Amino acid sequence: MKLIVGLGNPGREYELTRHNIGFMAIDELAKRWNISLNEQKFKGLFGAGFVNGEKVILLKPLTYMNLSGESIRPLMDYYKIDVEDFVVLYDDLDIPVGKLRLRMKGSAGGHNGVKSTISHLGTQEFQRIRMGIDRPKNGMKVVDYVLGRFTSEEIPDVNHSIEKAADACEEWLNKPFLQIMNTFNS
């Protein structure tokens, strides 16, 4: 069984914001794999299905970004999901829009959703797909930037990165994450 989590904030006002690119990737996977995200438990919205013979759970925590671990840990405990069968997708300011970076482990890098996940799991050793949103320009505050929407010029690159993140997740169902890293980080 695999758990794929996208980080974001709940509510219409946060839809399609930079901070919600993880949610957008989960929506793409749900559409691609015909999984309904209609169960609300564990402080999140989730759905399950079978993909290439593997049971997959998709989760969008509804706790707000900074408390994401409060949703992830109880679901992992309930379904007895090992940390190596878990991947999290989230926005990253240090990566250009449209680009991905896959990592096996690491610090939160200033991302509060990842910080909460590390805190609740008790480890930094979990797989991540970091989705580029770039840094704010012209002295814009980071909080305003991440809670802002992508520009019309960025949308094609955003859509491409969402598709590539979904492709990486799909390959991960049948291949080691390290192999997927080598493919998608090149």
Swiss-Prot record:
Listed GO CC annotations: cytoplasm
Q: What are the alphabetically sorted keywords of the record?
A: Cytoplasm, Hydrolase, RNA-binding, tRNA-binding
Alphabetical list of SUPFAM superfamilies matching this protein: Peptidyl-tRNA hydrolase-like
Q: What's a single GO BP term from this record?
A: rescue of stalled ribosome
| One function term, GO molecular function aspect | tRNA binding
| UniProt-annotated catalytic positions | H19
CDD domains associated with the record? PTH
Q: State which Enzyme Commission number(s) the record gives.
A: 3.1.1.29
Q: Does the keyword Cell cycle apply?
A: no
Residues annotated for tRNA binding in this entry = Y14, Y64, N66, N112
For the site Discriminates between blocked and unblocked aminoacyl-tRNA, which positions are given?
A: N9
Question: Which compartment or compartments is the protein found in?
Answer: Cytoplasm
Top-level taxon of origin: Bacteria
Q: Where is this site: Stabilizes the basic form of H active site to accept a proton?
A: D91
Record InterPro entries: Pept_tRNA_hydro, Pept_tRNA_hydro_CS, Pept_tRNA_hydro_sf
Reactions listed under catalytic activity: an N-acyl-L-alpha-aminoacyl-tRNA + H2O = an N-acyl-L-amino acid + a tRNA + H(+)
This protein's assembly is summarised as:
Monomer.
Function as written in the Swiss-Prot or TrEMBL entry: Hydrolyzes ribosome-free peptidyl-tRNAs (with 1 or more amino acids incorporated), which drop off the ribosome during protein synthesis, or as a result of ribosome stalling. Catalyzes the release of premature peptidyl moieties from peptidyl-tRNA molecules trapped in stalled 50S ribosomal subunits, and thus maintains levels of free tRNAs and 50S ribosomes.
Q: Which PANTHER family match?
A: PEPTIDYL-TRNA HYDROLASE
Q: Which family does it belong to?
A: Belongs to the PTH family.
Q: What is this protein called?
A: Peptidyl-tRNA hydrolase
